[in-house]
Amino acid sequence: MQNQGNKVLSAAMLDSADRYWLRLCDVWPEAKTALTAMQQQELTAVFGLSDYMGEQLCRHPEWIVQLFDGLLDDVVRSEFDAQLHSLIADLTQEELVKSALRRYRNLQMVRLAWRDFLNYTPVEESLLDLSALAEALVIAGRDWLYQEMCQQYGTPTSAEGNPQPLLILGMGKLGGRELNFSSDIDLIFTFPEHGETVGGRRTQANQQFFIRMGQRLVNLLDQVTVDGFVFRVDMRLRPYGESGPLVVSFSGLEDYYQEQGRDWERYAMVKARVLGPWSGYCDELHDLLRPFVYRRYIDFSAIESLRKMKQLIAQEVRRRQLTDNIKLGAGGIREVEFVVQSFQLIRGGREPALRQQSLFGAIDTLYSLGQLEYLAVDELKHSYIILRRVENLLQAIDDKQTQTLPNNELDWQRLCYPLDMADEVELRQKINQAMVTIHGHFNATVGGTDSHEHNDHWTALFWNVQQDEHANALLQEQQVDDAELWQLLSEWRQTVSKRSIGPRGRETLDKLMPKLLEELVTQTKPSQAFKPVAKVLDKILTRTTYLELLCENPGARQQLVSLCCASPWIARELANFPMLLDELIDPSQLYDITSIDDYPSELRQYLLRVPEDDMEQQMEALRQFKLSQQLKIAAADVTGVLPVMQVSDHLTFLAEAIIEQVVLQAWHQVASRHGIPAETSPSNMGFAVIGYGKLGGIELGYGSDLDLVFLHGHTGSGTTDGKRPIDNGHFYLKLAQRIVHLFATRTTSGELYEVDMRLRPSGASGLLVSEIEHFGAYLQQEAWTWEHQALVRSRFVFGDYSLAGRFSDLRAQVLKIERDKQVLAKAVKDMRIKMREHLLQVEPGQFDLKQSAGGIADIEFIAQYLVLANAHQYHELTIWSDNVRIFEVLAELELLPIMQAQHLTQTYCWLRDENHELTLQQLPGKLPIQSVLQKTDSVIEIYNEILAI
């Protein structure tokens, strides 16, 4: 053991220090003679406390001298900005700027970590120092790029001739000047007015200039080089997230937040602060955002919004099985932020003093306004400071963004040393007490879902009874006429007794089962209700958190029983993916279906909880979002809230939102390796996803696959702009391959969607992505009739909107080709016969909803034939890709008698409705033939009449 003042380094810390001393002496042999005994002792402590500091100081031994020569003195934050601008002012190459910024960042981070670990400064000051450093680095990079780009492209100006700057909103902890050691930084880029550049070799629109500048700035800060990175940059809080432009004007920001701003974006904007020197534009921007964040009235709706956000975080903790998380766990750092920001959102419209980004400042203001008692303020601040100090030290050990307590003894010792704690046990006790205190204040302010004691009545006896006669007597006493329930329950209990679920799990199960039985006996046939519920329980017996969730939430138990009874498909989903149980907690939210237009923004919000660079977690989050939204749709379906047409609408628009994010993720992954083609960006990628089949016809069902075709608009021989450039065609091929991979990879939450690419030109043997002109030529010159039929049910789903228009024109041109009706009718009928021969498998007396004569496929073929036969005369037939609206147009054009159109539409919707219902019951898509003849015989007559040869 070695003393540092009155503190002691453990043996493991000394071993770590010795390793760094050996490395240091290799690169600086005079180290021990150059440093005093006291300096050596302090450096030994630093080496033992932090691998990050050890690595950096061995790489840059000259920093040790600088640090001991005064750099460890109190930080003067204004010096960061001056030093950085001086450091890079004369540099002319971006790579040199990157290196300079990274070296400066690492030196200053070592300095701040040193001061933190050895208690040179309180944590509040440390957070201010880190925030000032980050802000100075961002602004130095921005200013260098602006000057460099103005020389190249001219200065962006407004219509009145005023130079336009790039303003950067710091969000989250950077905005609040409370940045922790290894945090990423959330930024939003904006500029005041549209216009053009002036004085360059060629003019550019201001937005184009700033998007290019923003891309370079993110790269300048975020890219990992031999010197490391400056800060990880997260741009997902901007309007429309990753699918939106990287930079928008003030007016664009204002329009977005007025028309589409979400509650979570209000919450995020509380912390928003313009970085860098203040100007009139900064005042203008804050004035523009204020009405969105702070309402003129006292806004208690903020409480419910924050409560929902907290529930989402709790779900994420459970789903990712996060333990010992001092940020997201109950009583963690996030709950303090929720408490303070709930008051800010509720009362900030009336109390200007609350409109501040700093949590410390806001909480003091709440006391001065009488909104929080002194004891509450004192306890919250004290507990928050403990957690922020632990978080900061935890991250400074190895410059890693983590809020999870250590899983090894050495790192616990490293935390205990600066916090004057004897050991892990004492420090854990201090942390736990802080989190209990915070959680109490959170529940008092924002509210939670803590359970109340439940009166278990007779079901507690029933669950614990050992003998058949006692069990049957209890059932008779309670007038439950279902003897099979006891038989099933006792058999299941015996099976469970052999499972290894641990004492906590068994205790929770014993509390849960009486409560669950109370729900089961309200069903018409409790024993039948128990069977699917038991399958769910089987899957979560070893996941005690989910047993506790059901135990503590009456709404979840009620929904579990009712939904499992209503749909075996839902029961299977809950059993296969227990994280869906979170969706059952609040029935009002379960049946509050996401509106059709909100799926993209809901998914963007959902993905914000996952680190942008964690590909595995991003893939898992996409699957979890799909599963949870699909469950909500199914719950509304089985309870009759949604008719079949709307079920398909919701499933289709959910898929579209997911396609958008998959394409964006694939784009970033391929671009990070190879760069991107010229004149492209995530919002202008020269790439399009075309949906065919049920996706194209807006008719997806549960478990539908996605029929996709990929197009790109780049011709010629250009290459990408990355360090490993490839030709543009190869880039789009890699993009398509990556998209398919992201869909098909099986994670713990399964496959995202099964993707069918066989409708692309030349089918499975063709290229995975087609240049749009080649695609058009193929359709007009080489495609079969069945490919033109498929085109009827196709539409642009996501991508570059310039390609959307080109695809729409191309589709219309092909559909409007004049065809010989006799030849067409024969080709359509032959294809239908071929399909039936390959796909129809029914027992005598059974009707296959899709493939039997008079079924779904016949109705689809009628629509496709009539479009292909008549679109050359009636261009309106090329507008829609769904059968229902095609029949409407056919009736309006008198190409189909209105009675026939109505009958086909009604039968089509009825067959799809039955198919949905059978899917939810986990039954094959077949019915007794007698139950459908009245409807389908008429379809057969219409089919034969229209396709008569």
Curated annotation (Swiss-Prot):
Location of region: Adenylyl transferase: 455-949
Molecular function via GO: [glutamate-ammonia-ligase] adenylyltransferase activity; [glutamine synthetase]-adenylyl-L-tyrosine phosphorylase activity; ATP binding; magnesium ion binding
Disulfide cysteine pairs (residue numbers): none
Record function comment: Involved in the regulation of glutamine synthetase GlnA, a key enzyme in the process to assimilate ammonia. When cellular nitrogen levels are high, the C-terminal adenylyl transferase (AT) inactivates GlnA by covalent transfer of an adenylyl group from ATP to specific tyrosine residue of GlnA, thus reducing its activity. Conversely, when nitrogen levels are low, the N-terminal adenylyl removase (AR) activates GlnA by removing the adenylyl group by phosphorolysis, increasing its activity.
HAMAP family recorded: GlnE
Enzyme class: transferase
A single GO cellular-component term on record: cytosol
Gene name of the record: glnE
SUPFAM superfamilies to which the protein is assigned, alphabetical: Nucleotidyltransferase, Nucleotidyltransferase substrate binding subunit/domain
Protein name, as recorded: Bifunctional glutamine synthetase adenylyltransferase/adenylyl-removing enzyme
Keywords: ATP-binding, Magnesium, Multifunctional enzyme, Nucleotide-binding, Nucleotidyltransferase, Transferase
EC number: 2.7.7.89, 2.7.7.42
